[in-house]
Amino acid sequence: VGFKAGVKEYKLTYYTPEYETKDTDILAAFRVTPQPGVPPEEAGAAVAAESSTGTWTTVWTDGLTSLDRYKGRCYNIEPVPGETDQYICYVAYPLDLFEEGSVTNMFTSIVGNVFGFKALRALRLEDLRIPPAYIKTFQGPPHGIQVERDKLNKYGRPLLGCTIKPKLGLSAKNYGRAVYECLRGGLDFTKDDENVNSQPFMRWRDRFLFCAEAIYKSQAETGEIKGHYLNATAGTCEEMIKRAVFARELGVPIVMHDYLTGGFTANTSLAHYCRDNGLLLHIHRAMHAVIDRQKNHGIHFRVLAKALRMSGGDHIHSGTVVGKLEGERDITLGFVDLLRDDFIEEDRSRGIYFTQDWVSLPGVLPVASGGIHVWHMPALTEIFGDDSVLQFGGGTLGHPWGNAPGAVANRVALEACVQARNEGRDLAAEGNAIIREASKWSPELAAACEVWKEIKFEFKAVDTLD
């Protein structure tokens, strides 16, 4: 029969350096740290086996199927520069291993079991190449960047947002009041914090009602379309959809979901509902650092970002870049492009291991939020460009005169930066001067500049921003 019981080395079956990848394969780049004494070929083959058809011993039922057709293959291994005992192992998976339109199944297969594997000291999924044949089975973002701009009638600049603080403890009425002040002052959006769901001090239905009132009042006063990210995340999918239905009945433009804590199945369900009912979907990445913070173990955020674009979301938080190290800036911009663009070339300097073709799947707006204020505006405008959402929580609500003047300061700073850029001025070199000039005409901006002036404006021109 040719069946021989016993344990055999993975590399005999799953390490195939001669393999030529197919256009339909899902390709993965793993950072593998083998246990002492385990050769990299065996470690890479073990990853390929455990995340596809393999098990720890030979089983007679292998003879009932065609392993060559279904097995994952480790087809290339390269050492990580500057690290000892770390390797990038490239694995190709046949498309038939995955259920169509299911990010959940894709992750269960590729990262579900293999991370606890004894032969590995650590394992990190650095990147995935999703083939067009698989992408075409996903709806993707409910609307995408262009449709969102058309819905909001806002063009030629980044959108402005603000997370309402304190995030927990306000009553629904006071929460709605804070929303109204920010929107009236000139912001496009305000936001529920990721952990605002339906707590005893503020039940979700009350919050939705008062926020809708704030939206309609501020729209009437400013003549602009406004929105508030109403967090629909809940303990069950049914409850989540119930909240989204109520938001739609109120006529508001956008809802929100925590896609990692809520899960990909719930997220994809909500994204389908949002497309069918004309709601935009804002995605928060709460819990991402548990998965992506360690350099040698876990999943890099660029993979989670790709998964979100497949599962569906119109905005996603993607870090701020400002004040960070140069290398992190390039890597952040790498996955920002993966979210927005239709076609992204392989570029290892930006952490992009594979060329990715999104075949017309709508793009996702990256959201910069966390510790930013008016002095960062030139840097953010230059780095992120027009297709982004800039969110100032404390940078709006921390204004000495209140929320509405804080919103005015941010809007004036943004309009000044966009105008300066359109006139051909160098935001990197002249950023501070541009903000100072604008503050002469805006007492609100002048007050904001004074409050945050001791925080340095750390931004040098970067050549790799094209």
From Swiss-Prot:
InterPro entries: RuBisCO (IPR033966), RuBisCo_large_chain_AS (IPR020878), RuBisCO_lsu_C (IPR000685), RuBisCO_lsu_C_sf (IPR036376), RuBisCO_lsu_fd_N (IPR017443), RuBisCO_lsu_N_sf (IPR036422), RuBisCO_lsuI (IPR020888)
Main location: plastid
Positions annotated as active site in the UniProt record: 165 (proton acceptor), 284 (proton acceptor)
UniProt xrefs under Pfam families: RuBisCO_large, RuBisCO_large_N
Localization (cell): Plastid, Chloroplast
Binding site for substrate: 113, 163, 167, 285, 317, 369
Key word Oxidoreductase present: yes
Any single GO CC term annotated in Swiss-Prot or TrEMBL for this entry: chloroplast
Stored CDD domains: RuBisCO_large_I (cd08212)
Top-level taxonomic group: Eukaryota
Modified residues (N6,N6,N6-trimethyllysine): 4
Post-translational modification: The disulfide bond which can form in the large chain dimeric partners within the hexadecamer appears to be associated with oxidative stress and protein turnover.
Catalytic reaction annotation: 2 (2R)-3-phosphoglycerate + 2 H(+) = D-ribulose 1,5-bisphosphate + CO2 + H2O; D-ribulose 1,5-bisphosphate + O2 = 2-phosphoglycolate + (2R)-3-phosphoglycerate + 2 H(+)
EC number: 4.1.1.39
Site residues, Transition state stabilizer: 324
Keyword line: Calvin cycle, Carbon dioxide fixation, Chloroplast, Disulfide bond, Lyase, Magnesium, Metal-binding, Methylation, Monooxygenase, Oxidoreductase, Photorespiration, Photosynthesis, Plastid
GO molecular function: magnesium ion binding; monooxygenase activity; ribulose-bisphosphate carboxylase activity
Binding site residues for Mg(2+): 191, 193-194
Family classification: Belongs to the RuBisCO large chain family. Type I subfamily.
Listed NCBIfam families: PRK04208.1
Additional comment: The basic functional RuBisCO is composed of a large chain homodimer in a 'head-to-tail' conformation. In form I RuBisCO this homodimer is arranged in a barrel-like tetramer with the small subunits forming a tetrameric 'cap' on each end of the 'barrel'.
Name of the featured protein: Ribulose bisphosphate carboxylase large chain
Organism taxonomic ancestry: Eukaryota, Viridiplantae, Streptophyta, Embryophyta, Tracheophyta
